[in-house]
């Protein structure tokens, strides 16, 4: 990623709630499986999965919005 892409990604991550951001980073950066994240955060697996997918959707909307400018 170049500097601009990293800035856009940080912006998209900052728009997420704390728990959503944590789940995305644990999965995408730390490489943890959703089941491991659920155990770590003491959340049901279904909750982790829904928060993860909701967070990705939010990030996609933000990033596509930045591309449209």
Question: Which residue ranges define each predicted feature?
Answer:
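Short helix-to-turn junction characteristic of helix-turn-helix DNA-binding domains
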Residues: 13-16, 27
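Acidic, proline/glycine-rich intrinsically disordered inter-domain spacer in sigma factors
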Residues: 1-14
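Short alpha-helical "packing" element that flanks the helix-turn-helix/winged-helix DNA-binding module
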Residues: 9, 23-24
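Short, leucine-enriched amphipathic alpha-helices that occur as contiguous helical runs
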Residues: 6, 20-21
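Hydrophobic patch in the ABC ATPase nucleotide-binding domain
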Residues: 5, 16, 32-34
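DNA-recognition helix of helix-turn-helix
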Residues: 20, 29, 35, 41-65
């Amino acid at each position: 990623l170049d500097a601009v892409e990293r800035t856009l990604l940080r912006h998209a991550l900052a728009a997420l709630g704390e728990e959503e951001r944590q789940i995305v980073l644990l999965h995408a950066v730390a490489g943890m499986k959703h089941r491991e994240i659920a155990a770590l955060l003491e959340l049901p697996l279904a909750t982790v999965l829904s928060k993860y997918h909701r967070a990705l959707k939010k990030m996609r909307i933000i990033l596509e919005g930045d591309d449209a400018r």
